Amino acid sequence: SSGPCCDRCRCTKSEPPQCQCQDVRLNSCHSACEACVCSHSMPGLCSCLDITHFCHEPCKSSGDDED
């Protein structure tokens, strides 16, 4: 099973930092998200409103295998 991941994460410069994932996903949020909000469109565009002290790993694979 894939763990939580986030490609676009923003953090404040405070200590500890306050980070939020700004990814938009179809119909769901990452697996660790507690506050997931989705639009009423089809498919739903969902974003996670959680504030954490860290960023999850990026979702995109590190290797360029999109050929």
UniProtKB/Swiss-Prot annotation:
Monomer. Although dimerization may occur in solution. Disulfide bonds join 5-59, 6-21, 9-55, 11-19, 29-36, 33-48, 38-46. The keyword Disulfide bond applies. Inhibits trypsin but not chymotrypsin. The inhibitor consists of 2 domains and has 2 sites of interaction with trypsin. Gene3D superfamilies: Cysteine Protease (Bromelain) Inhibitor, subunit H. Belongs to the Bowman-Birk serine protease inhibitor family. PROSITE patterns: BOWMAN_BIRK. CDD domains: BBI (cd00023). SUPFAM superfamilies: Bowman-Birk inhibitor, BBI. It comes from the Eukaryota. The keyword DNA-binding does not apply. Keywords: Disulfide bond, Protease inhibitor, Serine protease inhibitor. The record marks 13-14, 40-41 as: Reactive bond for trypsin. One of its GO terms (cellular component) is extracellular region. One of its GO terms (molecular function) is serine-type endopeptidase inhibitor activity. Seed. This is Bowman-Birk type proteinase inhibitor 1.
